[in-house]
Amino acid sequence: MDPPETVRGFILQPTYRIEGGRPVVHLYGRLETGETFLVRDRRQVARFYVRSRDREAARAAGVSGIAETDRRTLTGEPVDRVEVARPSNAPPLRDRLHRLGIPTFEADVRFAVRYLIDRGIRGSLEIRGPWQGGHAAGAAASGVDRVFDEPRLAPADWTPRLAVLALDIETDPEAERLLSIALHGCGASEVHMLCPEGAGCPAGAIGHASEAELLAGFARRLRELDPDVLTGWNVVEFDLRVLLRVAERYGGLLELGRGAGAVRLSRSWRRGPAVASIPGRVVMDGIQLLRGAFIRMESFRLDAVAREVLGEGKTLASGNGGREILRLFEEDREALAAYNLTDARLALEILERLQLVELAVERSRLTGLAPDRMGASIAAFDFLYLTELGRRGMVAPTVGAGEEPPGETAGGQVLDPRPGLYENVAVLDFRSLYPSLIRTFGLDPLNLLPEGAADPGGLVAPNGAAFRREPGILPALLDELFPRREAALAAGDRVTSVAIKILMNSFYGVLATPACRFHSPPVANAITAFGRQILLWTRNRIEEGGRRVLYGDTDSLFVETGEADPAAARRAARELAAALDRELAAWIEERHHVASRLELKFERLYLKLLLPPTRGGGRGAAKRYVGLVEEGSGRRTVFTGMEVVRRDWTDLARRVQQELYERLFAGRPVEDYLRDVLAELRAGLLDELLVYHKGLRKDPSEYTSTTPPHVAAARKLPGPLPEVMAYVMTEAGPEPAGHLRHPYDYEHYIDKQLRPVAEPVLDLLNKSFDALVGRGYQMGLF
């Protein structure tokens, strides 16, 4: 045993194991020395709470181990602590109490997460105590460098650089037979391939004589490379799931961790993505990292994302599928190895270019959650709020234990657009509106007064909810986060600024979500009610000053500047935003007696802006507009809510819409262009632009009452079904792309793809789409 020392580390995986009949916390991670570590602690007791007045009823229900505490509920009632021998004993006991009408508190907090909450540890920690090498500390620690048993822990400020390894496998068309495995990262870039005796193995590939040997060799090599993070594209749902299936077929376990234990797949909720657990490591799927970072992509397929982010794609077209992979395995293994390795490399390079692993680490350091839980906004809120509640001697209800049914929440204010084509339109934006409202008015579940309760000095929101004028948990957290984000922006630290922005913006959504223990319709509605009040106040002040507001949505207003020169328009917009900011602060101080934390900024200038009418004319269409902006030395057309940015429209519609608005803004003719498109379409020259893409949310056989086009096409597709169905409309209905038996239905595309994108532009020019298409044209039925 080495002498005590103090060292900083970062937690990759908080979990626990049962040892000697008792739960033992296990924290796996990486130290600032570069070594890996495991903290083991037997001192944590699994617990939850019940109201003190329910003590005897709980005992009658078979609950033992009840002890008095000095803690209270959010409404001020005293509570008792219920201790259980194992964390797994808590759920059935909790559910039994709920069935008897006895509410519980914090009976659903994960055991290892509770350990971190109790100590205020978020991601990074300081460890002080003796340690021993992992090889001498038992099977659970065999793959780590240092093992600390019951050390002293404290929060720390340290950011690690994690070792990341990308994995990609290739299989036969049925995803039953494993053909090759590529690994890229941690200093390696290699392909392990099934090469039975007598079969040639390509130069540079590592051959294995059987599928079982291929799997074992891969697992051994992964443990040698010892990554902190295992990643890939759809790596959990496909790669790891297939590898587990292969391991089961050979009667073994898939062991890839830093300690004893097989890879496990699970779902945190029924329709959520699968998550993988590997002892001591984190599995981060590239697709989920993108989505968790709120990065929008036209398609999340690896080829599409790689082309958009890196400027290069896969070496084979994705439409070739498993049959092409099998052909390469049989005829050209060198090409298969190159394809396999390219997929692994692209997956890792996308994460590196977008700094997605760094973002996950920073979000872990902010929220306390493990870095593979990027999308868990409710759990992040839970961690932060429960930590602060604990410091105040309070407990929160168990999710689902509340006595009141979930209430409805109202959204933000949307002003009816004034349809038309405008010049020099300024967008004024309230920065981080909902977090700023929480800070300004002290909106917090802890400050919410019970309905009907009187507080002469309280603050009343526009929805009627009343709040104490006391420091709340959320306002205090935001008071800490806002300056940290400003400092990160000033330092050019994009990762930290994005992580903080995502966290701050999640607070309102969590309060409005019934699945959250702190779900509070009065608080959520107070936030949006203040938002609506302030947006309308700002709109009225602008129009009282003689300018028109053309559109508004939640936190932004589109203002007609009335200036002919763009430079003058920008100057006027900045002056207007600054003046409104001052007036609003004075109004809030006078009306509500609080200091405004709101900030209205000039965001951008549209040199030209089109607000289209709804289909059928009349009113403007909310959340749909297109404008021309200056960027650097050039100009760019920006679409919001239009067909060009939606995946369920074809490339034909997107390409035509883009070109039409660029021509409209540039004053170039559109009719001749549309005639050319129609002629090329009917001549079959644009067939590659006619593919629809639609996700398959369930098996086609499960659609019984209706059959959407993509489902009808899927039923005609031979072989395994993709996650996203590619299909075209033919004269015989929808058919899978690449498997057509009938001619394209060009009139369908004219009616359903060209008409919707062309008519708004033609209407502005007083032109008719039907006249352009040709005399006697009738709308198709489908």
Which sequence ranges carry the predicted segments?
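DNA-dependent DNA polymerase catalytic subunits
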Residues: 4-8, 16-36, 351, 357, ...
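Mixed-charge, glycine-rich, non-catalytic linkers/tails in nucleic-acid processing enzymes
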Residues: 255-256, 281, 305-309, 313-392, ...
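Active-site-proximal helix-loop-helix substrate-binding element of RNase H-like nuclease domains
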Residues: 191, 200-205, 209, 226, ...
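DnaQ-like (DEDDh/DEDDy) 3′-5′ exonuclease domain used for proofreading
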Residues: 2-226, 341-342, 346-365, 369-411, ...
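A non-catalytic, amphipathic alpha-helix used as a structural packing/dimerization or gating element
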Residues: 335-350, 480, 484-487, 530-537, ...
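Glycine- and acidic
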Residues: 167, 200-205, 224-229, 287-288, ...
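Proline-aspartate-enriched helix->loop->beta-strand connector
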Residues: 218-243
